[in-house]
Amino acid sequence: MTIIRKKHPLIKIINHSFIDLPAPSNISSWWNFGSLLGLCLIIQILTGLFLAMHYTSDTATAFSSVAHICRDVNYGWLIRYMHANGASMFFICLFLHVGRGIYYGSYNMMETWNMGIILLFAVMATAFMGYVLPWGQMSFWGATVITNLLSAIPYIGTTLVEWIWGGFSVDKATLTRFFAFHFILPFIITALVLVHLLFLHETGSNNPAGLNSDADKIPFHPYYTVKDFLGVLILLMAFMILTLFFPDALGDPDNYTPANPLNTPPHIKPEWYFLFAYAILRSIPNKLGGVLALILSILILAAMPYLHTSKQRTLTFRPITQSIYWILVADLLILTWIGGQPVEHPFIIIGQTASIAYFTIIIILMPISGMIENNILDLD
């Protein structure tokens, strides 16, 4: 068995990635989220595949086909709610994974980090297009509002929007192409994940101390396979409680009303995992400025390696930057709350303040606190 594991050209790759992989001996549970994201991706692809067998991407029948899945298909309700809530679990794991990367300075592994940002954009695009498919009120108006943002691009904007729509409004052509893209993107994401892992295994994992762990490595199996399995059990437990007891807790009631182009919902808002970016978009009165801020809210992650001023990699022994980091987390929670609120006083000013704080913390405060800590510890 050992011979096959180490010699067979295909099994050898799996062996070097998940069995004999040298891993730091001190990585905490914050390093579990990579495997949990892999599990989420598998769940989403499998449930999505079964949904696609019964779904019809036509404006006249899309809403009815989803109702048919829930009412008439064997365990269709379970597959549908697993897919919808699986997206939420995916994003919870994603945000924790990125948050871990920022806290422990994992962004210094540039290729892995940049690949992760591309993955984040790809997953967000997939989730957005998936939200359009049930063809409820929020699906239709969400698609209209978000795609319409592209019209802010100078000169080519309007043409670009009509090209994406396949007409002069969100209609049958838009739904069909969104279904096609929503189907293909997870497989592209799977390929990108493999590249992400390839880059990670070039350098090896980071660790909570932020020190070189080459002198103290342990095999991935059995230590981290067992540890990851515990994480998997906890995730599945939380996932099934959410899916079976509170299936609609994270959804929007407006999406149980079929899409009607003549009737606008009182508050157009995306799924909860986009609310922070949506709040940043809305906090800028100018359309183009809002779109740029929206893109930058994610793209700013790519600047993090260049904004790292500290001589230490992680925040483990850096109390000043630690405090600023947790203020950033609180700020993101405030933005998420504001994104779901109507555009009126006092939410407008809170959203604008939180948006300014978000960029200020990342671009100005964290680099400055890094330099202050270097001075305090005489690390210059």
From Swiss-Prot:
Q: Where do the annotations place heme b b566 binding? A: H97, H196
Comment on bound cofactor:
Binds 2 heme b groups non-covalently.
In the record, the note on similarity to other proteins reads:
Belongs to the cytochrome b family.
Q: Which Pfam families match?
A: Cytochrom_B_C, Cytochrome_B
Q: What is this protein called?
A: Cytochrome b
Q: Which InterPro entries match?
A: Cyt_b/b6_C, Cyt_b/b6_C_sf, Cyt_b/b6_N, Cytb/b6-like_sf, Cytochrome_b, Cytochrome_b_C_euk/bac, Cytochrome_b_N_euk/bac, Di-haem_cyt_TM
Q: Does the keyword Metal-binding apply?
A: yes
MF terms from GO for this chain are:
metal ion binding; ubiquinol-cytochrome-c reductase activity
Judging by the UniProt lineage, the source's domain of life is Eukaryota
Keyword Mitochondrion tagged: yes
What does this protein's UniProt record list under function? Component of the ubiquinol-cytochrome c reductase complex (complex III or cytochrome b-c1 complex) that is part of the mitochondrial respiratory chain. The b-c1 complex mediates electron transfer from ubiquinol to cytochrome c. Contributes to the generation of a proton gradient across the mitochondrial membrane that is then used for ATP synthesis.
Biological process per Gene Ontology, one example term: mitochondrial electron transport, ubiquinol to cytochrome c
